Amino acid sequence: MSPIPMRSLVRGFKPYTAGLSIDEIREKYGIERVIKLASNENPLGTSPLVQHTLETHVGLAFRYPQAGNPRLVKAIAAHHGVSPSRVIVGDGSDEVIDLLFRICVEPGVNNAVAFMPCFGIYTTQAALCGVELRQTPVNADFSFPWDNLLKLVDDKTSLVFVTTPDNPSGYTPPVAELETLAKALPDTCLLVLDEAYMDFTDDEADYSLAKRLDEFPNVIISRTFSKSFGMAGLRLGYAIVPEELADHYWRVRLPFSVNLMAEEAGIAALQDVAFHDETVRV
């Protein structure tokens, strides 16, 4: 048989390394009782309202979800006080990040920038898309060396990723530093603030630009339902982006990538404020 046709960069590609599931741990180490903390899953499980919603809608699993998930988009927009035209959703925030690379960065021309270490999806998807990802190490105390980051940025930089709160350190830069960074970037560069853990901060306004996006047209806020909402297994993420980018996102996103169960669960999760708040308190 002739060699299977394959892009050269895929041969020897280093995949994302996920944490082991409980079943894998039991099988590998021969133990029954496993307390899993490695993947930052919600210790309270899944919202009772989300569970009820899934039970109610499981009979509709034969249906395709509505294109563009407009009910979910509207619920997320209301949650953040933004226009639905700025909200995009994906099969986990992984899909959102992947499509940002595919939409915003021209392979061989543009580049992206991030700190090191960073969320593994940045490196895998940059590599898969043939995009140069420039990185600089965080400081010894895990704080962010902004000057070093900005030295990597040039007129060909399309995306700058900052994870805040950072994982695994938990370091969270004050909002004033994010303001300075956003203003220092070229007009042609987008600042992606990956806020998967932002719900766990004491006062979001001290650390996030999510409520001030009208002041910063080059800022994207990315979030997930996996952590504080306890829905990691359903794969649901979203971002608040400039309207023009949202329009192009919906053009290229795979149809129905957010399934009907995840959509209904996401809407319910936003309604169960008590569960969310108890998760944050714990």
Task: Give short role names for the model-derived ranges.
Residues 127, 144-156, 168-191, 195-228:
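Active-site pre-lysine segment of PLP-dependent enzymes
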Residues 33, 83-87, 108-111, 156, ...:
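Short acidic capping loops at alpha-helix termini that bridge into adjacent secondary structure
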Residues 68, 218-282:
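PLP-dependent aminotransferase class I/II
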Residues 1-63:
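N-terminal "arm"/small-domain region of PLP-dependent enzymes with the aminotransferase-like
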Residues 62-111, 129:
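Phosphate-binding glycine-rich loop
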Residues 103-162:
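PLP-dependent aminotransferase-like
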Residues 40-43, 93-94, 119, 164-168, ...:
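Short glycine-rich anion-binding loops that position phosphate/pyrophosphate groups of nucleotides
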